[in-house]
Amino acid sequence: MPLKTSEPQYGKFGARLCAALAVAAVLACSTASHAQDEAKQKAGLSVWRSSGCSECHGAFANGEKERDEAPTGANLRQTRLDDATIAETIRCGRPGAGMPSFGADAYKERGCYGQPPGPAPDDLYPSALTLSAAQISDVVTYLRARIVGKRAVTPEECAWYYGEQASSNCDAPK
């Protein structure tokens, strides 16, 4: 007796429905991921502002410092550092270059730049502020998404940076 084969219970409509649901699930995950990334970018911007990063690097991280007496920070739009190196630079600072260390565990508890734990270098610029690993990660996310590899500041970028105060700050972004 031959085996009887039958059409799937829901036919072509069922297959299309399953495909549509699969696409919807992928889009929902993508949207949630985008929202989380956007939240980390905003958190990173908040840390960037509250930590005084723009004093040396400029509001848009282009090396145009905001205070004359501050050390001149690198133009992070042109950096070729990977995320791990950016994070280590924030955590450990740049001895001799004016970049302070923002990591509470830098040098003493956790070595920096391949060195074992020990005293901080004498030529490390002092910082009264420390950042958590999560805050440093948020700053790196912000820099990677909004700064690194970008050219001139666009009006949209300026508006995202300044938010509600954009109209008074974005007439001629740098």
Task: For each feature predicted by the language model, list its residue ranges.
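N-terminal secretory signal peptides that target proteins for export/translocation
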Residues: 1-15
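Bacterial N-terminal signal peptides
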Residues: 18-28
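Sec/Tat signal peptide C-region and signal peptidase I cleavage site
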Residues: 31-35
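Flexible coil segments in periplasmic/lumen-exposed cytochrome c-class electron-transfer proteins
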Residues: 36-40, 50-51, 59, 97-174
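Non-transmembrane alpha-helical segments in soluble domains
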Residues: 45, 87, 91, 137-144
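Short, cysteine/histidine-rich loop/knuckle motifs that typically chelate Zn2+
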Residues: 55
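Short, non-ligating residues that shape and space the ligands of small metal-coordination modules
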Residues: 62-63
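Short Fe-S-cluster ligation motifs
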Residues: 83-104
